[in-house]
Amino acid sequence: MGLPWYRVHTVVLNDPGRLLAVHIMHTALVAGWAGSMALYELAVFDPSDPVLDPMWRQGMFVIPFMTRLGITSSWGGWSITGGATPNPGIWSYEGVAGAHIVFSGLCFLAAIWHWTYWDLAIFCDERTGKPSLDLPKIFGIHLFLAGLACFGFGAFHVTGLYGPGIWVSDPYGLTGKVQSVNPAWGVEGFDPFVPGGIASHHIAAGTLGILAGLFHLSVRPPQRLYKGLRMGNIETVLSSSIAAVFFAAFVVAGTMWYGSATTPIELFGPTRYQWDQGYFQQEIYRRVSAGLAENQSLSEAWSKIPEKLAFYDYIGNNPAKGGLFRAGSMDNGDGIAVGWLGHPIFRDKEGRELFVRRMPTFFETFPVVLVDGDGIVRADVPFRRAESKYSVEQVGVTVEFYGGELNGVSYSDPATVKKYARRAQLGEIFELDRATLKSDGVFRSSPRGWFTFGHASFALLFFFGHIWHGARTLFRDVFAGIDPDLDAQVEFGAFQKLGDPTTRRQTV
């Protein structure tokens, strides 16, 4: 045929049997990738420290998606929440991976069968005997089945009526676990951080899909609408399908990047906005203040801060800190977190408490500036020593740690104080192991960042694909050069330009 690479899919344009075959093969490839990727991740995943080395720090991509749907245990005897687990049965991480691979193999065989036996009676129009698909009817069938699956997921899986429920956590990502969720039918169901909205929206959307599917199965489209939207053309199906996919991709890119109940921070890591807004820092200070109000000492109050909460308040877990093209997990960047050193409190020689100004997200370097409670600069690490007025040495800054491994330890040596002031720019201070993975010290993004970038990029690409194929199907007659109002019988091949009698070919 000699088709250029960008036109090879025309071979299935008027061949319903093989069009079905290539779609089944595509499903086989997707399911096969998912199962294989899950097995690879399980082979390299270390479940030993869910607090300081969670899945998102290790660069896991498919494990978080399995976990949010209710899978928490492995046939290897470990649980995602830590500790040993009894036999989880078929629906373990390995079981899900295996199910995808088996499904992929069955789809592979089905694709070969449909490629071989392409000329089936079901694809032929009874009146003409030629290949033909009733596309509005097929649309109704697919809408009905998709609605059924959507309703079933919301009504049974999410609610725990017949299924495990989904991953639910508190606003600070500390107490997450898989549990059943009751549908939220009030206005709170529209809050993207309320899990009940997932159940209610799937039930509502599924019901709508079922009803819409039945409508399209029982009601034929008007002739003008059928012709106007080119409902008889398979490229119309391609165009509208691409529209559905790119719209969904834009939506999930948003819910992933800005955060929602569907993207828990325990599974995908915190969002950049939680660093920008000091979200975890405020909660930590609130807990410390509450402890002091209960007559606890500063050391006791800080010691009660969960290590998990302190770890979220560290810039290395900000997905916007990693470059888009820096390959590898977060652990390959700043290293594997080993322990929280504690919260450093800086004071000048007059006893004023000083706060290190934190590094904004999009800075690689940032001046070390210490301010008092009123925001007045009291100390810094100067760029030019000759002009310094606020240097650590001149101001006499000391640091004392509360909570963590260095609880109660204080330093007055200027070099040590400056070292911890620099590290305090990055949030809470952690000991990081860079030797094990030969980590290079350059921040990496989390799976939250990769997912967002990938889906936003492909959504943009698919948007242009929708415009392209939509234009092709709507203006097919224009592109082909055939006048849609041409009444004369047209003989293909008789004219150089189809339907133009002034370009009749000359016989040799």
UniProtKB/Swiss-Prot annotation:
Keywords, sorted A to Z: Chlorophyll, Chloroplast, Chromophore, Membrane, Photosynthesis, Photosystem II, Plastid, Thylakoid, Transmembrane, Transmembrane helix
Ranges annotated as spanning the membrane: 21-36, 101-115, 140-156, 203-218, 237-252, 457-472
Membrane topology term: Multi-pass membrane protein
Protein name: Photosystem II CP47 reaction center protein
Subunit record text: PSII is composed of 1 copy each of membrane proteins PsbA, PsbB, PsbC, PsbD, PsbE, PsbF, PsbH, PsbI, PsbJ, PsbK, PsbL, PsbM, PsbT, PsbX, PsbY, PsbZ, Psb30/Ycf12, at least 3 peripheral proteins of the oxygen-evolving complex and a large number of cofactors. It forms dimeric complexes.
Cofactor notes: Binds multiple chlorophylls. PSII binds additional chlorophylls, carotenoids and specific lipids.
Taxonomy of the source species: Eukaryota, Viridiplantae, Streptophyta, Embryophyta, Tracheophyta
NCBIfam families hit by this protein: PS_II_CP47
Disulphide bond pairs: none
UniProt-listed InterPro entries: PS_antenna-like, PS_II_antenna-like_sf, PSII_PsbB
Cellular component, GO annotation: chloroplast thylakoid membrane; photosystem II
Subcellular location: Plastid, Chloroplast thylakoid membrane
Database matches in PANTHER family: PHOTOSYSTEM II CP43 REACTION CENTER PROTEIN (PTHR33180), PHOTOSYSTEM II CP47 REACTION CENTER PROTEIN (PTHR33180:SF38)
GO process terms (BP): photosynthetic electron transport in photosystem II
Entries under SUPFAM superfamilies matching the protein: Photosystem II antenna protein-like
One Pfam family named in its UniProt record: PSII
HAMAP family attached to this UniProt entry: PSII_PsbB_CP47
